[in-house]
Amino acid sequence: MSPKNNHDPSSSGDSGNTNVQEADLQEMEDVNNSLDALSCALDAVEQRTDDIMSQLRELLNSNREIRRLIAEENDNAPESGDDNMDGQAGSEAAPK
């Protein structure tokens, strides 16, 4: 924005000051409105970021739980799998 210089030395001092003050007030109001709009936009971005972070935490916890369950299944599977393998090997070896 360029500075507003409405001062005319030939005009009366009071009306010149009034015009400058009104222009300054209008410019400040415009800046204030722009700042309010930016604040609202930033609030929306912050809310969206919070929502995404919450979803990511839920996904992380879900993945951790699934990995824990898979690890438990894998820990239990070799024990029962070894028993079946031994049983199959013994029963196959007997008929031969």
UniProtKB/Swiss-Prot annotation:
Residues 8-21 have a biased composition (Polar residues). It comes from Drosophila melanogaster. Transmembrane segments: none annotated. Residues 1-28, 70-96 are annotated as: Disordered. Belongs to the UPF0184 (EST00098) family. The keyword 4Fe-4S does not apply. Residues 72-85 have a biased composition (Acidic residues). This is UPF0184 protein CG14818. It comes from the Eukaryota. Residues 21-77 form a coiled coil. The keyword Iron does not apply.
